[in-house]
Regions:
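N-terminal "mature-domain start" segment
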Residues: 20-58, 122-123, 131-133, 184, ...
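Bacterial N-terminal signal peptides
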Residues: 7-16
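Short, solvent-exposed coil/turn segments at beta-strand boundaries
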Residues: 37-41, 66-68, 134, 154-161
Length: 208
């Protein structure tokens, strides 16, 4: 417990120093359902994202680069995943399983985490995390070029949120960016739950 308290204290001091050195502004996208403290204005790019099971779904990347590093929020939209997997099932038949449409979505956090691990040279932190009782994962890694990545990944209603701050090794950890994500509804109100809503991970699933 003493070691944990030291980590928390050190993190708090880091965050304070970093907040002073860098101007943070709130950014919200009701369309994509999130709000976060950003280090500057985001550039927005729409991309095609190939899932672990090989289908292509739309994603939107919000990114900002400055002299401290690159900061991005990637929102991957898996909401049409089941339909795309059903189309593949009709093409392949018995060689393909109907459940893959749900598995692809439920495994998306682990898949995104693996991609971050694969590009790292060392991993300093790699564990479960949650925000507003929505399950996720956090990682802190060092890359071959000595930059450090502070990442957080969450899945909510078939949308995957990948928070990635890859920064210079000589600045304080950008924890403000990694840990300030909030989920919002179409009116911009913050979404919170009293319990863990497992059924809200994958949208459109028929309950039995």
């Amino acid at each position: 417990m003493r070691f944990l308290r030291l980590i928390i204290l050190a993190s708090a001091l880091w965050f304070c120093g970093f907040a002073v050195a860098q101007r943070w502004i709130p950014y919200a996208s009701a369309t994509d359902g999130f709000r976060i403290m950003a280090p500057g204005e985001f550039a927005i790019e729409e991309i095609d994202f190939e899932t672990e099971y090989g289908i292509v779904v739309p994603a939107r990347v919000f990114s900002h680069e400055n002299d401290t590093g690159r900061y991005s929020v990637t929102v991957v939209d898996y909401r049409e995943s089941q339909r795309l997997h059903d189309e593949r099932l009709r093409e392949i038949g018995a060689l393909y399983q109907p459940i893959y449409g749900q598995v692809d979505v439920r495994g998306s956090v682990a898949y995104a985490a693996k991609k971050i691990r694969d590009r790292a040279s060392t991993i300093e932190y790699d564990a479960y995390h949650y925000i507003s009782r929505i399950d996720g994962h956090q990682l802190q890694t060092t890359n071959p070029d000595q930059t450090r990545t502070f990442a957080a990944i969450y899945l909510y209603e078939s949308r995957l949120y990948v928070i990635d701050a890859t920064a210079s090794p000589d600045i304080a950890p950008p924890g403000m960016f990694q840990q300030s994500l909030e989920f919002i509804d179409e009116d911009g109100e913050v979404i919170t739950f009293r319990n863990f809503p497992d059924d809200r991970k994958v949208s459109g699933v028929v309950k039995r």
